[in-house]
Amino acid sequence: MLKAMKIVIVNGPNLNLLGRREPSIYGTKSMEQVLVDIQRAYPDVHFEYRQSNHEGDLIDWVQSYGLVSLENACLQAVDGRSATPVDRPSGCSRVVKGIVLNAGGYTHTSVALRDAVACTEVPVVEVHISDITKREAFRQVSLLTDVCAHSIVGHGTDGYQEAVEWIINHNK
Protein backbone atom coordinates (compact mmCIF):
# COMPACT_ATOMS: atom_id res chain seq x y z
CA MET A 1 0.00 0.00 0.00
CA LEU A 2 2.80 2.45 0.83
CA LYS A 3 4.46 2.05 -2.56
CA ALA A 4 1.44 3.59 -4.26
CA MET A 5 1.08 6.29 -1.62
CA LYS A 6 1.89 9.89 -2.41
CA ILE A 7 1.95 12.61 0.24
CA VAL A 8 2.38 16.26 -0.65
CA ILE A 9 4.06 18.71 1.72
CA VAL A 10 3.08 22.34 1.13
CA ASN A 11 4.87 25.17 2.93
CA GLY A 12 3.88 28.82 2.94
CA PRO A 13 5.71 32.10 3.29
CA ASN A 14 9.16 32.35 4.85
CA LEU A 15 9.50 28.60 5.33
CA ASN A 16 12.15 28.67 2.61
CA LEU A 17 14.28 30.29 5.33
CA LEU A 18 13.82 27.45 7.81
CA GLY A 19 17.05 26.89 9.73
CA ARG A 20 18.13 30.50 9.27
CA ARG A 21 15.08 32.56 10.27
CA GLU A 22 14.56 33.03 14.00
CA PRO A 23 16.27 29.77 15.05
CA SER A 24 15.23 30.36 18.67
CA ILE A 25 11.61 29.85 17.53
CA TYR A 26 11.88 27.60 14.47
CA GLY A 27 15.11 25.68 15.13
CA THR A 28 18.26 25.29 13.07
CA LYS A 29 17.24 22.39 10.82
CA SER A 30 16.69 23.33 7.17
CA MET A 31 13.64 22.12 5.27
CA GLU A 32 15.97 20.16 3.02
CA GLN A 33 17.16 18.18 6.05
CA VAL A 34 13.58 17.71 7.27
CA LEU A 35 12.68 16.25 3.87
CA VAL A 36 15.74 13.95 3.84
CA ASP A 37 14.79 12.66 7.29
CA ILE A 38 11.18 12.04 6.25
CA GLN A 39 12.17 10.21 3.06
CA ARG A 40 14.64 8.11 5.05
CA ALA A 41 11.91 7.21 7.57
CA TYR A 42 9.39 6.34 4.84
CA PRO A 43 11.36 5.11 1.80
CA ASP A 44 8.31 3.52 0.16
CA VAL A 45 6.24 6.71 0.18
CA HIS A 46 6.49 9.15 -2.71
CA PHE A 47 6.76 12.73 -1.42
CA GLU A 48 6.25 15.88 -3.36
CA TYR A 49 7.31 19.19 -1.82
CA ARG A 50 6.08 22.67 -2.66
CA GLN A 51 6.90 26.02 -1.04
CA SER A 52 5.82 29.51 -1.97
CA ASN A 53 5.63 32.94 -0.46
CA HIS A 54 2.54 33.61 -2.60
CA GLU A 55 -0.97 32.83 -1.38
CA GLY A 56 -2.37 31.93 -4.81
CA ASP A 57 0.28 29.24 -5.31
CA LEU A 58 -0.73 27.55 -2.05
CA ILE A 59 -4.39 27.65 -3.06
CA ASP A 60 -3.63 26.21 -6.50
CA TRP A 61 -1.59 23.36 -4.98
CA VAL A 62 -4.18 22.51 -2.32
CA GLN A 63 -6.85 22.39 -5.02
CA SER A 64 -4.86 20.38 -7.54
CA TYR A 65 -3.53 17.82 -5.02
CA GLY A 66 -6.56 17.79 -2.75
CA LEU A 67 -9.34 17.15 -5.21
CA VAL A 68 -9.31 13.43 -5.84
CA SER A 69 -11.61 13.86 -8.81
CA LEU A 70 -8.98 16.04 -10.50
CA GLU A 71 -6.02 13.88 -9.46
CA ASN A 72 -7.55 10.45 -10.01
CA ALA A 73 -9.82 10.84 -13.00
CA CYS A 74 -9.87 12.61 -16.30
CA LEU A 75 -12.99 14.28 -17.63
CA GLN A 76 -13.81 13.99 -21.27
CA ALA A 77 -16.47 15.95 -23.15
CA VAL A 78 -18.38 13.89 -25.67
CA ASP A 79 -20.11 15.65 -28.58
CA GLY A 80 -20.66 18.80 -26.54
CA ARG A 81 -22.60 16.91 -23.87
CA SER A 82 -21.71 17.03 -20.20
CA ALA A 83 -18.33 15.71 -19.15
CA THR A 84 -18.05 12.02 -18.39
CA PRO A 85 -15.48 10.46 -16.05
CA VAL A 86 -13.02 8.15 -17.75
CA ASP A 87 -10.36 5.87 -16.29
CA ARG A 88 -7.02 7.23 -15.16
CA PRO A 89 -4.17 6.67 -17.58
CA SER A 90 -2.34 3.44 -16.73
CA GLY A 91 0.86 5.36 -15.97
CA CYS A 92 -0.79 7.22 -13.07
CA SER A 93 0.09 4.80 -10.30
CA ARG A 94 0.42 7.18 -7.38
CA VAL A 95 -2.60 8.76 -5.79
CA VAL A 96 -2.31 11.63 -3.33
CA LYS A 97 -3.36 10.29 0.07
CA GLY A 98 -2.88 13.45 2.06
CA ILE A 99 -1.43 16.93 2.29
CA VAL A 100 0.85 18.23 5.03
CA LEU A 101 0.26 21.99 5.16
CA ASN A 102 2.26 24.62 7.00
CA ALA A 103 0.65 27.79 5.70
CA GLY A 104 2.92 30.05 7.75
CA GLY A 105 1.44 33.51 8.21
CA TYR A 106 -1.47 32.72 5.89
CA THR A 107 -2.79 30.47 8.67
CA HIS A 108 -4.03 33.58 10.44
CA THR A 109 -5.19 35.66 7.48
CA SER A 110 -6.25 33.67 4.42
CA VAL A 111 -9.95 32.95 4.07
CA ALA A 112 -9.26 31.91 0.47
CA LEU A 113 -6.77 29.23 1.56
CA ARG A 114 -9.23 28.07 4.22
CA ASP A 115 -11.91 27.70 1.55
CA ALA A 116 -9.52 25.66 -0.64
CA VAL A 117 -8.69 23.33 2.27
CA ALA A 118 -12.40 22.94 3.05
CA CYS A 119 -12.96 21.66 -0.52
CA THR A 120 -10.30 18.95 -0.41
CA GLU A 121 -11.21 15.30 -0.73
CA VAL A 122 -8.01 14.07 0.96
CA PRO A 123 -6.97 14.72 4.56
CA VAL A 124 -5.00 17.89 5.17
CA VAL A 125 -2.83 17.95 8.28
CA GLU A 126 -1.98 21.43 9.54
CA VAL A 127 1.56 21.75 10.93
CA HIS A 128 3.15 24.59 12.86
CA ILE A 129 6.71 24.34 14.11
CA SER A 130 6.08 26.67 17.04
CA ASP A 131 3.11 26.56 19.38
CA ILE A 132 0.96 29.28 17.84
CA THR A 133 -1.34 29.23 20.87
CA LYS A 134 1.52 30.63 22.96
CA ARG A 135 2.70 33.27 20.50
CA GLU A 136 1.54 36.82 19.80
CA ALA A 137 -2.24 37.34 19.90
CA PHE A 138 -2.47 37.71 16.11
CA ARG A 139 -0.82 34.29 15.65
CA GLN A 140 -3.11 32.48 18.08
CA VAL A 141 -6.02 32.24 15.65
CA SER A 142 -5.90 29.62 12.90
CA LEU A 143 -8.43 29.94 10.11
CA LEU A 144 -7.43 26.42 9.01
CA THR A 145 -7.70 24.17 12.07
CA ASP A 146 -11.41 23.45 11.85
CA VAL A 147 -11.23 22.50 8.15
CA CYS A 148 -8.14 20.30 8.52
CA ALA A 149 -8.35 16.60 9.39
CA HIS A 150 -5.67 16.99 12.07
CA SER A 151 -3.44 19.70 13.51
CA ILE A 152 0.07 19.46 14.98
CA VAL A 153 1.50 22.53 16.68
CA GLY A 154 4.60 23.19 18.71
CA HIS A 155 6.49 19.96 17.98
CA GLY A 156 9.27 21.66 16.06
CA THR A 157 10.22 20.22 12.69
CA ASP A 158 9.29 16.77 14.04
CA GLY A 159 5.71 17.86 13.41
CA TYR A 160 6.19 17.19 9.71
CA GLN A 161 7.07 13.54 10.32
CA GLU A 162 4.18 13.24 12.80
CA ALA A 163 1.84 14.56 10.10
CA VAL A 164 3.14 12.00 7.59
CA GLU A 165 2.64 9.24 10.16
CA TRP A 166 -0.93 10.46 10.79
CA ILE A 167 -1.71 10.35 7.04
CA ILE A 168 -0.24 6.86 6.68
CA ASN A 169 -2.25 5.57 9.64
CA HIS A 170 -5.39 7.29 8.40
CA ASN A 171 -5.04 5.47 5.07
CA LYS A 172 -4.58 1.96 6.52
Identify the function of each model-found stretch.
Residues K3-I7:
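Extreme N-terminal starter segment of soluble prokaryotic enzymes
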Residues V8-N11, I129-L143:
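Mobile beta-alpha loop/short-helix "lid" or hinge segments that flank ligand
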Residues L17-E32:
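Glycine- and acidic-residue-enriched helix-capping/strand-helix junction motifs
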Residues V45-G56:
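Short beta->alpha junction loops
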Residues L67-V95:
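Intrinsically disordered, low-complexity domain-flanking/linker segments in eukaryotic proteins
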Residues R94-E136:
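Mid-chain, well-packed structural core segment of small domains
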Residues R139-T157:
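Short beta-strand elements at the ligand-binding edges of bilobed clamshell
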Residues V153-K172:
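A charged, well-structured terminal subsegment
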